[in-house]
């Protein structure tokens, strides 16, 4: 099967379609707005269709974090998520980072698999992160999302 290659570019503006994607990965608009102000938002296009998004944020000297990454639901399971992760890794290298980090929920089974397949390793678990930072309970894959699983990749 020939996988379509995404066109990934620095996002110029934030609109409802982009917010819908960002909110797939993070249900808090306030938190999304906060890291959009501080990070760089990259949009991914399959032809003329917005297919995905990720946000890179410099968190410490020599370290960047993918603070949000999402693929449009109708386009998931087509390898686009992997393209986004690999693009973020390349961008981090070009920024001179030594480490790239990402965090996801304990219930995000597919994401945990993807990140490890891309070379990330589990670094830590922030217990009850989602209970402390989100007003609404989050459920995914029939599991309550409670803990943040932190992963890293040395570049």
Curated annotation (Swiss-Prot):
It is an enzyme of class 2 (transferase). SUPFAM superfamilies: Acyl-CoA N-acyltransferases (Nat). It comes from the Bacteria. The keyword Transferase applies. It holds the Pfam family Acetyltransf_1. InterPro entries: Acyl_CoA_acyltransferase, GNAT_dom. Residues 6-155 form the N-acetyltransferase domain. CoA binds at residues 69-71, 77-82, 111-117. GO terms for molecular function: acyltransferase activity, transferring groups other than amino-acyl groups. Its EC number is 2.3.1.-. Probable N-acetyltransferase. This is Uncharacterized N-acetyltransferase YvbK. The lineage of its organism: Bacteria, Bacillati, Bacillota, Bacilli, Bacillales. The gene is yvbK.
């Amino acid at each position: 099967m020939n996988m379509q290659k995404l066109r990934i570019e620095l996002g110029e503006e934030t609109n409802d379609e982009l917010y819908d994607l960002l909110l797939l990965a993070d249900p808090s608009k306030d938190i999304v707005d906060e890291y959009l102000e501080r990070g760089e938002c990259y949009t991914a296009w399959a032809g003329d269709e917005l297919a995905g998004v990720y946000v890179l944020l410099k968190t410490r000297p020599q370290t960047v974090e993918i603070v949000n990454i999402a693929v449009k639901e109708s386009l998931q399971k087509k390898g686009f998520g992997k393209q986004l992760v690999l693009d973020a890794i390349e961008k981090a290298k070009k920024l001179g980072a030594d480490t790239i980090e990402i965090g996801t929920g304990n219930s995000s089974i597919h994401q945990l698999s993807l990140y490890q397949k891309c070379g990330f390793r589990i670094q830590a678990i922030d217990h009850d992160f989602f209970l402390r930072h989100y007003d609404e309970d989050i459920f995914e894959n029939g599991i309550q999302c409670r803990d943040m699983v932190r992963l890293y990749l040395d570049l």
